């Protein structure tokens, strides 16, 4: 099991290779990363048998930026018939697993395998259970089968608590018809990724206030309003009338980069298309100057050296807060609903929080 297999957004295979190579160097795990363009996946092949396991034990998956999912294991070839027997034979040295996910890569070829996986899962689950290799137990490893085709599969393991919360790392979020734009799903996914679900009532509630910079027409504002917050929407463009009719939104025609609230707010969100360094500096200022307690800001990525640029900006933000003596939790992820961008979440840890009713 010396290969670490990772899913990603098509076109970002190189960023995954760079990021995982950085991690391997930090953890002294020898090996090499490889990927083909536009395949929506990458691998890190370890020279030592326990290398992939050491990578996974040494890193919280949620803190990786570009990988959507990961698993340690190996590829196997499957015959046209009796695939299950071959899979069971290769699992002889696998531990008993607590859950089973069948996955495909996020490409057109991968999506064509979805129906096959749906039909195959039932018989495979039954066979694994009968062989004593699968039980219902979240404390045990998750068995992840990623099909590259009907004849090739990556047989992998991952800790259910240290891997993606959805199969392939793709959330199943329903677009709310009342929201004025599909960008609303970006902020909802960000909350799922950065905020544990059992903390939503404490950190996203109706006694809170928020600011949406570059708000029009209101996709992100809608998420704040849906949690009952009072929102100041900053944009020179028009906001959706349905949002204004809620009575929870104040729309100010102003520049998102120069606006500052008169009183501190709980949340600042921003999806302005601008150079990433400028958005990062604004994010650091809002948190550092105490204008907000938590923030979600998108950083649009350059055409080249995307991982290097994100890493540089995150280090600059972290160094800035360290110099100020401010305690901040910093997260960054390329979400499923992101395109040529990543989403940053910052939470100031040394200020009092608003209490839910």
Swiss-Prot record:
<dbReference type="Pfam" id="PF18125">
    <property type="entry name" value="RlmM_FDX"/>
</dbReference>
<dbReference type="Pfam" id="PF21239">
    <property type="entry name" value="RLMM_N"/>
</dbReference>
<feature type="binding site">
    <location>
        <position position="271"/>
    </location>
    <ligand>
        <name>S-adenosyl-L-methionine</name>
    </ligand>
</feature>
<dbReference type="InterPro" id="IPR040739">
    <property type="entry name" value="RlmM_FDX"/>
</dbReference>
<feature type="active site" description="Proton acceptor">
    <location>
        <position position="300"/>
    </location>
</feature>
<comment type="similarity">
    <text>Belongs to the class I-like SAM-binding methyltransferase superfamily. RNA methyltransferase RlmE family. RlmM subfamily.</text>
</comment>
<feature type="binding site">
    <location>
        <position position="255"/>
    </location>
    <ligand>
        <name>S-adenosyl-L-methionine</name>
    </ligand>
</feature>
<comment type="function">
    <text>Catalyzes the 2'-O-methylation at nucleotide C2498 in 23S rRNA.</text>
</comment>
<dbReference type="InterPro" id="IPR011224">
    <property type="entry name" value="rRNA_MeTrfase_M"/>
</dbReference>
<keyword id="KW-0808">Transferase</keyword>
<dbReference type="InterPro" id="IPR002877">
    <property type="entry name" value="RNA_MeTrfase_FtsJ_dom"/>
</dbReference>
<keyword id="KW-0489">Methyltransferase</keyword>
<keyword id="KW-0963">Cytoplasm</keyword>
<dbReference type="GO" id="GO:0032259">
    <property type="term" value="P:methylation"/>
</dbReference>
<feature type="binding site">
    <location>
        <position position="183"/>
    </location>
    <ligand>
        <name>S-adenosyl-L-methionine</name>
    </ligand>
</feature>
<dbReference type="GO" id="GO:0006364">
    <property type="term" value="P:rRNA processing"/>
</dbReference>
<protein>
    <recommendedName>
        <fullName>Ribosomal RNA large subunit methyltransferase M</fullName>
        <ecNumber>2.1.1.186</ecNumber>
    </recommendedName>
</protein>
<keyword id="KW-0698">rRNA processing</keyword>
<dbReference type="InterPro" id="IPR048646">
    <property type="entry name" value="RlmM_THUMP-like"/>
</dbReference>
<comment type="subunit">
    <text>Monomer.</text>
</comment>
<feature type="binding site">
    <location>
        <position position="235"/>
    </location>
    <ligand>
        <name>S-adenosyl-L-methionine</name>
    </ligand>
</feature>
<dbReference type="GO" id="GO:0005737">
    <property type="term" value="C:cytoplasm"/>
</dbReference>
<dbReference type="Pfam" id="PF01728">
    <property type="entry name" value="FtsJ"/>
</dbReference>
<feature type="binding site">
    <location>
        <begin position="216"/>
        <end position="219"/>
    </location>
    <ligand>
        <name>S-adenosyl-L-methionine</name>
    </ligand>
</feature>
<dbReference type="InterPro" id="IPR029063">
    <property type="entry name" value="SAM-dependent_MTases_sf"/>
</dbReference>
<keyword id="KW-0949">S-adenosyl-L-methionine</keyword>
<dbReference type="GO" id="GO:0008757">
    <property type="term" value="F:S-adenosylmethionine-dependent methyltransferase activity"/>
</dbReference>
């Amino acid at each position: 099991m010396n290969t670490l297999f990772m899913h990603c957004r098509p076109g970002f295979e190189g960023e995954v290779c760079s990021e995982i190579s950085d991690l391997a160097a930090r953890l002294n795990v020898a090996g090499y990363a490889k990927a083909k363009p536009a395949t929506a996946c990458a691998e890190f092949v370890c020279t030592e048998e326990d290398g992939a396991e050491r990578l996974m034990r040494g890193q919280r998956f949620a803190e990786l930026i570009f990988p959507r999912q990961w698993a340690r294991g190996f590829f196997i070839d499957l015959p046209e018939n009796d695939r299950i027997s071959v899979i069971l034979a290769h699992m002889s040295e696998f531990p008993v697993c607590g859950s089973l996910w069948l996955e495909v890569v996020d490409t057109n070829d991968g999506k064509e395998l979805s129906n096959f996986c749906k039909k195959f899962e039932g018989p495979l689950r039954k066979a694994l259970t009968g062989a004593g290799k699968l039980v219902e137990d979240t404390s045990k490893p998750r068995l992840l089968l990623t099909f590259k085709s009907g004849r090739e599969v990556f047989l992998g393991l991952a800790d259910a608590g240290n891997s993606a919360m959805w199969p392939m790392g793709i959330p199943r979020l329903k677009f709310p018809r009342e929201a004025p734009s599909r960008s609303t799903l970006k902020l909802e996914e960000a909350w799922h990724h950065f905020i544990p679900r059992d903390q939503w009532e404490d950190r996203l509630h109706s006694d809170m206030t928020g600011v949406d910079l570059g708000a029009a027409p209101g996709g992100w504002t809608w998420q704040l309003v849906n949690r009952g917050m009072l929102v100041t929407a900053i944009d020179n463009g028009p906001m959706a009338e349905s949002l204004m009719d809620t009575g929870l939104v104040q729309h100010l025609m102003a520049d998102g980069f120069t606006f500052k609230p008169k009183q501190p707010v709980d949340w600042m969100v921003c999806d302005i298309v601008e150079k990433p360094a400028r958005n990062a500096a604004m994010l650091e200022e809002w948190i550092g100057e105490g204008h907000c307690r938590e923030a979600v800001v998108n950083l649009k990525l350059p055409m080249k050296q995307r991982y290097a640029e994100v890493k540089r900006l995150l280090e600059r933000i972290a160094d800035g807060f360290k110099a100020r003596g401010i305690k901040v939790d910093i997260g960054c992820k390329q979400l499923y609903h992101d395109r040529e961008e990543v989403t940053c979440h910052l939470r100031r840890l040394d200020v009092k929080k608003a209490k839910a009713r």
